[in-house]
């Protein structure tokens, strides 16, 4: 008796959530997925980058993909209800919803959606992401959007939370100049490499965050073929902007704040005009230890 094992759909050895092609985001929009180690500043980076794109005259949509649903609060200045919570209220009859029920306008016209997530230990985050995109398409809310940013939960790269990679053109990885952050980045590079076999997503580069220096990031980039697209030092104004529930573009324009604003504007311009798809060759765990962990 023989059996046949079909080739994995999303990269060799992976068993992942496959999105319905009917809910793909339309061609034309720049779609960016932001990943990185938990607590590294992805939501701050995503929100400020969304604000920067809007400053360049682009119509921007940010989708938070985290059960904490705190991705967009610096844009909206509040915690907004999640798509999954709103759908549950109408017993998942999406035709009963209006766009204003789940999409909220934030700073400088940035549109904000929080997908939310299933209760802890149940369900799949990838399903929630898919339902969010499906809902946006049903209401024709993606047709005039120039830039879509997915802000993704922590450094989880399972099939569910890798789902935004199936919609994205590019992935930006946020990291600090330390071993743990770079170790997580290496795992994310592996996930993107697997997805790139069957989807359009490519590595867009690295965002160095909360780091005075970038020597460890530079060593990793040189070894793996990555590139740093922006460098944000540990500036107190960025921390204070989170406490004030606002973007860096709404802070008093001190010298430090203007420098950060310009770096975000430069990152946005480069993602629009000057980004090169990176191949990215992840290291084995032991290789990272040898490269960064021990002298």
From Swiss-Prot:
Binding site for ATP: 39-44, 68, 209-210
InterPro entries the record matches: NifH/chlL_CS, NifH/frxC, P-loop_NTPase, Protochlorophyllide_ATP-bd
Binding site residues for [4Fe-4S] cluster: 124, 158
Cofactor names: [4Fe-4S] cluster
Free-text cofactor note: Binds 1 [4Fe-4S] cluster per dimer.
Positions bound to Mg(2+): 43
Similarity section: Belongs to the NifH/BchL/ChlL family.
Pathway: Porphyrin-containing compound metabolism; chlorophyll biosynthesis (light-independent)
Complex formation: Homodimer. Protochlorophyllide reductase is composed of three subunits; ChlL, ChlN and ChlB.
Pfam families on file: Fer4_NifH
Catalytically driven reaction(s): chlorophyllide a + oxidized 2[4Fe-4S]-[ferredoxin] + 2 ADP + 2 phosphate = protochlorophyllide a + reduced 2[4Fe-4S]-[ferredoxin] + 2 ATP + 2 H2O
PANTHER family named among the record's database cross-references: LIGHT-INDEPENDENT PROTOCHLOROPHYLLIDE REDUCTASE IRON-SULFUR ATP-BINDING PROTEIN
This protein's name: Light-independent protochlorophyllide reductase iron-sulfur ATP-binding protein
Enzyme Commission numbers on file: 1.3.7.7
Enzyme category, top tier: oxidoreductase
GO molecular function annotation: 4 iron, 4 sulfur cluster binding; ATP binding; metal ion binding; oxidoreductase activity, acting on iron-sulfur proteins as donors; oxidoreductase activity, acting on the CH-CH group of donors, iron-sulfur protein as acceptor
Keywords assigned by UniProt, alphabetized: 4Fe-4S, ATP-binding, Chlorophyll biosynthesis, Iron, Iron-sulfur, Magnesium, Metal-binding, Nucleotide-binding, Oxidoreductase, Photosynthesis
Organism: Prochlorococcus marinus (strain MIT 9312)
Record GO biological process: light-independent chlorophyll biosynthetic process; photosynthesis, dark reaction
SUPFAM superfamilies per the UniProt record, alphabetical: P-loop containing nucleoside triphosphate hydrolases
NCBIfam families given in the database record: DPOR_bchL
Function: Component of the dark-operative protochlorophyllide reductase (DPOR) that uses Mg-ATP and reduced ferredoxin to reduce ring D of protochlorophyllide (Pchlide) to form chlorophyllide a (Chlide). This reaction is light-independent. The L component serves as a unique electron donor to the NB-component of the complex, and binds Mg-ATP.
Gene: chlL
């Amino acid at each position: 008796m023989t059996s046949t094992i079909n080739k994995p759909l999303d990269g060799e050895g992976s068993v992942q959530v496959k999105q319905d092609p009917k809910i793909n985001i339309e061609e034309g929009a720049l779609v960016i997925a932001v990943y990185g180690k938990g607590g590294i500043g992805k939501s701050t980076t995503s929100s400020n980058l969304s604000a920067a794109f809007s400053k360049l005259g682009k119509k921007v949509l940010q989708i938070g993909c985290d059960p904490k649903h705190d991705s967009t609060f610096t844009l909206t200045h509040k915690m907004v209800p999640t798509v999954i919570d709103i759908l549950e209220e109408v017993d998942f009859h999406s035709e009963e919803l209006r766009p204003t029920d789940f999409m909220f306008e934030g700073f400088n016209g940035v549109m904000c959606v929080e997908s939310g997530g299933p209760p802890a230990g149940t369900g799949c985050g990838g399903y929630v992401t898919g339902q969010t995109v499906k809902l946006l398409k049903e209401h024709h809310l993606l047709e005039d959007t120039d830039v879509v940013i997915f802000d993704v939960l922590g450094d989880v790269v399972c099939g569910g939370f890798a789902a935004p990679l199936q919609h994205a053109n590019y992935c930006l990885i946020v990291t600090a100049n330390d071993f743990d952050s770079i170790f997580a980045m290496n795992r994310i590079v592996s996930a993107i490499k697997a997805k790139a076999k069957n989807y359009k997503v490519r590595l867009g580069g690295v965002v160095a965050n909360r780091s005075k220096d970038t020597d460890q990031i530079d060593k990793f980039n040189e070894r793996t073929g990555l590139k740093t697209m922006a460098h944000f030092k540990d500036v107190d104004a960025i921390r204070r902007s989170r406490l004030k529930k606002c973007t860096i573009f709404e802070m008093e324009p001190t010298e430090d704040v203007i420098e950060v604003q310009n770096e975000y504007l430069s990152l946005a311009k480069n993602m629009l005009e000057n980004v090169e798809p990176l191949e990215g060759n992840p290291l084995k765990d032991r290789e990272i230890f040898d490269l960064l962990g021990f002298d």
